[in-house]
């Protein structure tokens, strides 16, 4: 019987039994993106290896949309700013994801923006129309909207 541990919130069976040829198969699962160190121990001997888990792009969602700067002049050049954060279903940041952006009331935004390594992206909004503009960030079937004022 071999004892098994794993770091970074990864899950393993606490013990596994050797096959007739002396090998074991260790199944490691995780909902946390990143590197997990898996250690197998028997008697006073142990070996460790790193395994890597990546965020699940299939479950990309807009986890957060926050207004960073509001109340800019309606001059078509001075921007209000929002920050969107994209994660998978387990809250792992997703880099390199394309977020669709819309704004109403005549406001102008880039139609798509791409997330940074931490899963965030800044959205700049300009307008020549004074008033409230709803800004919507979307990915897959997930979207959030926030109002900004010019």
Identify the meaning behind each predicted range.
Residues 1-150:
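The feature marks long extracellular or luminal low-complexity segments
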């Amino acid at each position: 019987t071999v004892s098994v541990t794993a770091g970074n919130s990864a899950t393993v069976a606490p013990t596994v039994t050797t096959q007739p040829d002396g090998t074991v198969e260790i199944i490691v699962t995780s909902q946390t993106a990143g590197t997990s160190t898996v250690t197998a121990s028997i008697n006073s001997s142990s070996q460790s290896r790193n395994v890597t888990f990546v965020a699940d792009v299939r479950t990309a969602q807009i986890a957060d949309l926050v207004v960073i700067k509001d109340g800019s002049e309606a001059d078509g050049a001075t921007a209000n700013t929002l920050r969107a954060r994209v994660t998978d279903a387990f809250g792992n940041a997703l880099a390199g994801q394309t977020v669709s952006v819309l704004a109403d009331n005549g406001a102008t935004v880039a139609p798509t923006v791409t997330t940074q390594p931490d899963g965030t992206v800044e959205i700049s909004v300009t307008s020549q129309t004074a008033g409230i503009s709803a800004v919507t960030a979307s990915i897959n079937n997930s979207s959030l909207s926030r109002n900004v004022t010019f």
